[in-house]
Amino acid sequence: MSRIFARTIGLIVVALIIGEGVLRGIGIPHTLDSGWKWENSPGRKSSKYNDLTTNQLGYRGQRIHYDTDDYVVVLVGDSGLEAFAGPPEHMPEQFLLKSLSSRFTKPVKVFSLAASGWGQDQQLLAVQEYFKTYRADLVLLWPTLGNDYWENAFPDRSPTPEAGHLKPTFRLIDQELHGPYFRSGSYWHGSAVLQLAESAIAKISKETLEQRILRNWIKAMPAPHESEKQAHEGLCEGLTVIDQREFYRDIFELDPNIGYTLKSGDDFLNSRGFFSPYMSDSSERDRYLIRITQMLLKRIKEEVERHQAKFLVFHAPREEFDRRGARMVKCVSDSQGSIFRVSFDYEGLLKNIISSDDLVIIDLPWGEGNKHVVSPEDRHLNDIGNEQVMERLAVSLMERSLFDR
């Protein structure tokens, strides 16, 4: 009986190996479509400047070319650096190049590694990709502090319960980063056979493969919130209720002396949203977002320094987000009707996860109004805003004596 069992197991293993080879050979199922650069960027889809103007690595921006004596600066980020609302010649890399070149006699080159919707997980992979071929003297990372934390924790890009586009990401286990998982061109579970089986189950369940991947991923994450509707409903009573998009669109027309509850479509119960790192009563999963972001930034810094370059993170506090919005928003409600108290301090949290030696805070007198943003509905910085940030960043770098004049 034992010989028959062993022979049966052996035949199954051989069949699986043969099946794996056959499936890979005929391309069924397709490998994972994971991550994105400029060609498939969410920003490009909504931009009127959507030509495939990219560097050699596929990111929006000028071609990567430098001479031996050039001081090479690499900007790393997301939609802020991709600047999809404007032409390529008005990207932050161009403004920073102009500002640095006017201050230093040594030739300077500036290049971008950025795409809309990126967190530090895809940024880390981009930095690793860059250093396989190119060098840098300085790497500057521009975080988006309302999005990066939750983006870093999940294998998809969506703040709702519905799974978004798949992306490569990492998992934090016992304070160690593991991954990346779900790299483009790979198979889920590392197997075409297993991915085909998962796809069949997903089809029977009338869901996407991405939704199945997300559900599987979430099971291994720290504990989420229980429903906070009853716990916080009384604390948020009497606040002015307003849609989140409407709030930020009209923020300079609203009364800054009263508190607001923002209605959001985000999935705060599962820590998938703009305010998740800033919950007054945070869940284990909320705190996990912060820890994994800290570890990803640490890994990026290590990668940069391993290639003999300097690493800095810079943040330009915004009037509508860091100051006015932080004072006015007291509560948020999510897509499932749960209500949460929030208290957010972008700069304060950033200072908790980044050493002051590696952080540049760019204070600008933004004032009230929308002259520095694309539009009231789209609060990405426009050419005016980006030029001001890059000008002040250049001054800050000069003050740190990072360049020879």
Q: What feature does the model see in each segment?
A:
Residues M1-V72, P87, T133-D137, Y149-A153, ...:
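N-terminal secretory targeting modules
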Residues F5-R7, E377-R405:
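Histidine-centered active-site loop/cap adjacent to the catalytic His
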Residues V72-V74, G80-L166, T240-T261:
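Conserved SGNH/GDSL esterase-like catalytic core that processes O-acyl groups on lipids
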Residues G80-G86, S112-S116, D286-I290, I339, ...:
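Second-shell loop/turn segments in exported
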Residues G146-K351, G367-H372:
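Serine-dependent acyl-ester chemistry module
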Residues R24-F104, V127, C236, E246, ...:
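Membrane/wall-proximal cationic-aromatic binding patches
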Residues S112-A114, H315-P317, D363-P365:
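Residue-level recognition of beta-strand->loop/alpha-helix junctions
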Residues Q120, L124, I290, Q294, ...:
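Short, amphipathic alpha-helical "lid/cap" segments that border enzyme active or binding sites
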